[in-house]
Amino acid sequence: MKLSEIKNGNLSAEWAEKGYELPKFDIEAVKAKTHAEPTWVHFGAGNIFRAFPAAILNDALNTGKYDRGVIVAESFDYEIIDKAYRPYDNMSLLVCLKSTGEIEKKVVASVTESLRSEE
């Protein structure tokens, strides 16, 4: 199972079987609209950003309440862009362990572009 399978439209039953929540929106359409008409550039590409603001935007995209993604820029640790964003087409896995012991697994695809602030 690879995140690139999701972007390429190869949504195998294996993802659903394993309990992953997948994006319900057209990732490429959101990416194109964000590139043409950007509305949010976020500085700071760390885990808190990916787990909270990016995940909330992902939910808004899933429900059709919003139609653009976020562009993230990093000004300190460029390695996060080079190793955690770009190799995975800017998608992330959000895994939450709930107090009941249930594990929630979600693919976050709301980040449409990742930049080093020097670019």
Regions found by a protein language model. Name each.
Residues 1-118:
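Non-transmembrane, aqueous-exposed alpha-helical and coiled segments at domain scale
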